[in-house]
Design a protein with these regions (language model features):
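C-terminal binding/interaction regions
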Residues: 1-31, 60, 86-165
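Structured beta-strand/loop patches that form or line metal/cofactor-binding pockets in enzymes
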Residues: 23-65
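Glycine-rich phosphate/pyrophosphate-binding beta-alpha loops
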Residues: 42, 70, 128
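Active-site phosphate/pyrophosphate-handling residues
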Residues: 48, 77, 130
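Short, thiol/selenol-centered motifs that function as redox-active sites or metal-ligating centers
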Residues: 66-75
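Alpha-helical support elements that line or immediately flank enzyme active sites
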Residues: 75-87
Length: 165
């Protein structure tokens, strides 16, 4: 997202985020889940559970549940839409690009994020980056089958499980 974006463009981004907060996609439980993980941020109260039905390296279905701020829920909703039906490798790559945009190592226009670009402005608010990445953190732990390790608050940089010490 261009930091010098016109007010109309910024309003559009805000509308996308609020739409996903009000009516989150893929919200609910997934009893037949093959992978699960939970991400919590005790400092703000965000708490997101991600459940996946994975077969042959593909996310056949995804659900998330929990509670959190508008950014947390909207990000988890957009994440769910973006990875539903996709291969695990795609989900990992998208998470890396999204995290790169929020942490400033990748420009939004270079990341090919689709609707997720509407959350790029979060990078201007460092305390909210964890909110936008919490669902993704849980997703990466679910994919890595590390549900127990995602139970605690995520590290500051929200590195995926394979990159954490």
């Amino acid at each position: 997202m261009n930091p010098d974006a016109a007010p109309v463009e910024l309003d559009l981004y805000q509308d996308v985020v609020m739409d996903h907060k009000r009516a989150p996609r893929h919200f609910g439980t997934l009893p037949e889940a093959t992978h699960r993980a939970r991400g919590r941020n005790p400092s703000c109260g965000d708490d997101v559970q991600v459940a996946l039905d994975v077969a042959q390296g593909r996310i056949r279905d995804i659900r998330f549940s929990g509670q959190g701020c508008a950014i947390c829920i909207a990000s988890a909703s957009m994440m769910s839409e973006a990875v539903h039906g996709k291969e695990l490798a795609f989900a990992r790559d998208l998470q890396q690009r999204f995290r790169g945009v929020l942490t400033g190592t990748l420009e939004p226009e270079d990341a090919a994020l689709g609707k997720l670009v509407s959350l790029a402005g979060v990078r201007n608010y460092p305390s909210r980056i964890k909110c936008a990445l919490l669902g993704w953190h849980a997703l990466m732990h679910a994919i890595a089958d590390q549900a127990d390790k995602a139970e605690s608050a995520a590290p500051a940089d929200m590195a995926p499980p394979e990159q954490q010490p």
